[in-house]
């Protein structure tokens, strides 16, 4: 099993442990879009309590990648996605948070190239 496959398997297992129903195909697509950042501890996690981090998720993913208009609904969706992973959970994996956001805004049909983060595939 490749390191990438191990990461995706970890995301799938973590999502199941949390009771989140995220298709494996979507987690795989999002993880590929995140590129090498999934292997970097800090970059692979989202802090639900850090305002700067939430702004990055909003601007770099929801607005730039998913093509959504800036609104309070985006902030609420980020809060909901991080809360779904547990408020005391310190390992909020970016791939899972992003997958939850993709599902929330019904953007599952986007091509992988649309989800690429920082030019990574």
Q: What would you call each of these model-derived segments?
A:
Residues 50, 110-121:
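Short alpha-helical "patches" and their helix-cap loops
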Residues 15, 34, 38, 65, ...:
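Generic structural signal for hydrophobic core residues of well-folded globular domains
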Residues 2-55:
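Core of compact, soluble alpha-helical bundle domains
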Residues 25, 29, 33, 76, ...:
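Amphipathic alpha-helical interaction segments
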Residues 7-16, 70-89:
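Short amphipathic alpha-helical segments and their helix-coil junctions
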Residues 22, 45-49, 65-73, 84-93:
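Short acidic, glycine/proline-enriched loop segments that cap or flank alpha-helices
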